[in-house]
Amino acid sequence: ILLVLARLGLRRGEVAGLCLDDIDWRSGELTVVGKGGRVERLPLPVEPGEAIVAWLTDGRPECDTRSVFTTLRPAGQPLSAGAIGHVVGSACQRAGLARIGAHQLRHSLATAMLRAGASLPEVGQVLRHRSARSTAIYAKVDEVALRPLARPWPGTAPGPALPDAAARSLALPWPGGRS
């Protein structure tokens, strides 16, 4: 579940809605029913594909449901979107990490793509956004990544700010004669 969320950027409801018939193993594609009932075919990368195979062969209980991800007890009930979120939170807790929501994995994929040089339209295509505005939300400013690109303010020394730097900056005369 985590790999499907993190590598494909699916929403938790899309993961919950995956059925066995949605996976075309021959073509390496996944059919996803997205927001608004839109049906889209996505490539299935090797890593999440192998994780799904491992779940289907070693983890998923025998059951009649066609849902890919099911409960263990009671056996074979389709997981809800809320249960997908719970799986993410529980995995974080077991790993000793701060709890995050399933949607944070979608954000992380977008951030990783942008850091690797993908354009906003490319990220939007992977996330299946209809609007560029939706994708722009994922392009939050990354201070750490931007710091090496920014030129220092004239007269400032590299490194951490001095404790009284703010006070000194207030004493500087304003351009245009104001002080």
How should each PLM-predicted stretch be described?
Residues L5-R26, L120-E122:
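Short, charged phosphate-coordinating catalytic segments
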